[in-house]
């Protein structure tokens, strides 16, 4: 149900103070159609009990953030006399979507049945949220702490933070920290699992309990959880706990952030005008978990919940830490990597002479195999849509693909966009009913909200390549109704008949 913050409740009392209050009203929405909504009282008075510490964590579904926060609440609950409240908020994606953890700790009973929006501590566990401009730091109280997990230097961080965030940080004396849990996890041997490192960093910065005690209790919990897996695994977790304490870096906030330079104009979107408008007006704020700020009038053209199809291609979530890069010399052009890709983010193309000339100069090309023909071959990756599952590497028989940092592949996004928009089927290509030939067909399901490496979307995407628009989809409730029909971000690129028993 919709969150009811104190600002909405105070709005009711403010309305009742009037000589002629509205006999009918709504709260929690901006109703500019019937004009029955009450304006929220901002800033709302702090209603939490004195001494309550409020913390908010922005994570990525499947990255361990929620699990780590549940573990933190257990440690604090078992070893202190504090009251605890924990609530976990999710978007409509499976793994790889936004998770927001709301944690409260205090010496008095906690009676706050609403999201945290005046936090003592906010953590961003995925740097893509900073790049996309999510409103995170705006929920930090003046003088509070904002921690970002990223691989950036202070100068690079300044480049990625938008003007609104910089000004809020400077004007409200926000204590800004970064931690590179991404590289630390790889160095320790934990791969993508940054949650333990970030959990100990939280204990260091949030001052909920003495850090030495927190480290001791975290290590005891790790011993209990992983003891059966051997001393090496336990020791790895010990190193991660210590790393989180030691790797926190304080960023000195420049005075210039109080008057930051304006952000560059947003990139111009291409596509059907009605889709572009829907993306700008609805999809972008919804994707940033800011949909509650939209007025009722924003949905005037969508009263029945129908949205333009193909909008998932505009999300460009950029959540993968590592993405594939293709080695043209090693590749045997079997197309198996594209065949197994769950999100249609790696695709083969054959280019004629004119398409080669018009392609971006960084396009990697190879002669067709087993013998050279009139076309050039390429395997292209969309780094901002890839989920980083690595299935393409697993299936490649010759090691022609490797995973590299996403930011190193930024120049390949224009290549992918050009190929999708301008390069199509050619005469003489392999048959559609083969693994290789099917992957030259345009998928009609792309960039869905399924889990990284999901086999279900691989099958569904393949069917659209084999049968195209000659389809009727009868869908049972489950994962497929979540990744296939989320509000405003449809992964289907054509208007298919779609029924569900949801």
Give short role names for the model-derived ranges.
Residues 312, 336-356, 382, 387, ...:
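Iron-sulfur cluster-binding cysteine motifs and their immediate structural context
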Residues 55-75, 192-196, 450-462, 467, ...:
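Conserved phosphate/anionic-ligand binding catalytic regions in large, soluble enzymes, centered on
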Residues 1, 49-61, 65-284, 356-360:
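Active-site cofactor/cluster-binding pocket
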Residues 2, 63-67, 92-95, 130-132, ...:
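Flexible loop/turn segments at secondary-structure boundaries
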Residues 2-54, 238-241, 245-325, 333-335, ...:
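Flexible inter-domain linker/hinge segments
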Residues 218, 487-492, 496-497:
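Mobile "lid/hinge" segments at catalytic clefts and subdomain interfaces of large enzymes
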Residues 498-502:
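Conserved small/polar residues in nucleotide/adenosyl-binding loops
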Residues 54, 83, 122, 144-146, ...:
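Beta-sheet entry/capping signal
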């Amino acid at each position: 149900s919709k969150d009811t913050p104190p600002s909405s409740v105070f709005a009711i009392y403010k309305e009742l103070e009037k000589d002629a209050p509205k006999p009918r009203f709504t709260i929690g929405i901006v109703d500019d159609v019937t004009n029955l909504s009450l304006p929220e009282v901002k800033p709302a008075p702090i209603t939490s009990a004195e001494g309550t510490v409020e913390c908010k964590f922005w994570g990525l579904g499947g990255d361990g953030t929620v699990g780590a926060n549940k573990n933190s609440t257990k440690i604090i609950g078992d070893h202190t006399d504090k009251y605890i409240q924990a609530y976990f908020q999710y978007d409509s994606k499976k793994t790889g979507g936004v998770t927001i953890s709301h944690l409260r700790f205090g010496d008095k009973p906690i009676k706050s049945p609403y999201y945290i929006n005046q936090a003592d501590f906010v953590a961003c566990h995925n740097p893509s949220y900073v790049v996309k401009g999510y409103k995170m730091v705006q929920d930090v109280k003046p003088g509070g702490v904002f921690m970002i997990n990223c691989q950036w230097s202070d100068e690079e961080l300044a480049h990625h933070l938008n003007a609104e965030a910089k000004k809020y940080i400077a004007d409200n004396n926000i204590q800004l920290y970064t931690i590179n849990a991404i590289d630390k996890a790889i160095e320790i041997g934990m791969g993508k699992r940054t949650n333990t490192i970030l959990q100990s960093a939280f204990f260091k910065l949030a001052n909920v309990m003495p850090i030495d005690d927190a480290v001791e209790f975290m290590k005891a919990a790790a011993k209990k959880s992983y003891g059966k897996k051997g001393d090496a695994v336990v020791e790895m977790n010990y190193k991660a706990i210590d790393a989180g304490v030691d790797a926190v870096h304080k960023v000195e906030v420049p005075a210039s952030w109080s008057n930051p330079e304006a952000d560059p104009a947003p990139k111009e979107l291409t596509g059907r005008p009605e889709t572009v408008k829907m993306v700008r007006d609805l999809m972008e704020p919804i994707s940033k978990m800011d949909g509650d700020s939209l007025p009722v009038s924003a949905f005037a053209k969508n009263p029945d919940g129908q949205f333009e199809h193909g909008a998932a291609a505009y999300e460009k979530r950029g959540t993968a830490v590592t993405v594939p890069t293709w080695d043209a010399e090693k590749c045997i052009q079997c197309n198996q990597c594209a065949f197994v890709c769950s999100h249609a983010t790696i695709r083969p193309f054959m280019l004629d002479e004119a398409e080669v000339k018009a392609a971006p100069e960084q396009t990697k090309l190879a002669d067709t195999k087993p013998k050279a023909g009139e076309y050039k071959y390429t395997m292209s990756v969309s780094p901002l849509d890839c989920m980083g599952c690595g299935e393409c590497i697993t299936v490649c028989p010759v090691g022609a693909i490797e995973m590299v940092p996403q930011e190193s592949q930024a120049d390949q996004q224009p290549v992918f966009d050009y190929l999708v928009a301008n390069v199509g089927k050619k005469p003489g290509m392999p048959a559609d009913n083969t693994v290789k030939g099917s992957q030259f067909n345009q998928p009609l399901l792309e960039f869905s909200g399924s889990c990284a490496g999901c086999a279900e979307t691989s099958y569904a995407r393949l069917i659209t390549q084999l049968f195209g628009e000659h389809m009727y989809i009868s869908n049972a409730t489950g994962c497929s109704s979540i990744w296939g029909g989320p509000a405003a971000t449809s992964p289907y690129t054509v208007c298919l008949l779609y029924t569900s028993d949801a």
